[in-house]
Amino acid sequence: MNVLVFEDSRVDRLGVLTAARPACDLMIGASSLHDALAHLGHVQRVVRPHLARHIAGLAGRRITLWGGATPSLTTEPPASSHGATAIVVNARVVPSRRNIQSLRSLVETGHRGTVREHGTIAAAVLHLSADGSGPDHAAWNSLRDTGSTATLETLELMELDGSLDLLHEPHDVITAHEEAIEGSLAMLLDTGRFGETKPGLFVADGASVADQVVVRQGPVVVAAGAEIGPFVCLDGPAFIGSGARVNPHAWIRAATALGMACRAGGEIEATIMEPFSNKPHDGFLGHSHVGSWVNLAAGTITSNLKATYGPIRLHMMLPDGSRETIHTGRQFLGAMIGDFA
C-alpha cells in the first residue's frame, strides 16, 4: 500500500505549531498522523516548500528538524504498489483511533472515491495503474510533485461513506488530543509490547519506573528507555515516550503525552511535549502544546484559565500579516509553543 499525505492551503492556520514541521508530524494522543499511517504502508509527505527543501537534504541524517525519525526519501511508489490501491490523506486529519480505523477500512474496501469534510478532501482512494498511466496516476503524480490537489479535484470520484476529523485552528490540537489519547493508548497496548506492572501502569521492556511511583488512574503507558523517578504521581490517560525522563516528585496529570527524550518535572496537565523538549523543574504547564527543541526554565508557569473563568479567545497572526481573534469556546487553554522557541 502506498500512502501520500499532503498539506493543503489551510495548514498555515495552525500557526507556530506547524511553522517548522509538517502538520502530519504533530503528536496528538500518543502518535503523529505520519507514524500512524506508516502501519498502512509506505508513506510519502507532500509539504510546504521550506520543509520540502529540508526533507530533500536529510540523506545521512538520523533526526529531522522537528525531532522525528528521518523519513524515506523515495519519491516513486514501491514496485509492488503499481497497479494497486493507494490512498491520499490530508495532513490535518486527526490521528485518533476512529480516524485511523476509518482510513484502514477505506484501504481494505478499496473502493475508488473521496471522503470530504465540509467540502475539503480529507482522504481519497485511487487505483494506480500497473503501467503508470491513467487519470488516477496523473492526479497522484501531480499532487506529489506540485502539492496541488487541482488534478485530484477533476477526477470523477464517488463520495465514500464515513467521516474524518480535521484540525482547523491551533486550539483544535489540544481538543483533539484530549479526545484521542485514550484510544491512541489502546492502539499501543494492542501491540502487546507493554506489560502491566501495577494497576493502570503499562511498561515496555527497557523502561525504568521507581517503586515509589503512584498511579492514581490509568492507563499510563511508558515506552522503552523511559525513566520515572521516585515519588511521582501519575494520572492517566498519559503517555511517556521512549527515552523520556520524569524527575522525582513530578505530577503528570491526565491527557499528558511526553515525546521521545523529553525531560519533565513539576506539574503537567493535558499537554503535548514534542520530542527533545525540556521542562525538568518545578512549575506548571497545562493544556499546552510544546514543540521540539524547547527548554522551559525553572519555575515556568503557564496560565490556562482566565480570571473570569470564561471562554478563552486566541489572538493570531495570519500568513498575510493580518490579525484575527478566534473564539475557542474552551475554558482551559495554555501556551502554543513552536519548535525551537
Where would I find each of the regions flagged by the language model?
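Terminal amphipathic alpha-helical/low-complexity segments used for targeting or macromolecular assembly
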Residues: 1-200, 205-206
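Short, conserved interaction/coordination micro-motifs, predominantly
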Residues: 209
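Flexible, glycine/small-residue-enriched loop-and-beta-strand segment within the central core
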Residues: 213-222, 227-337
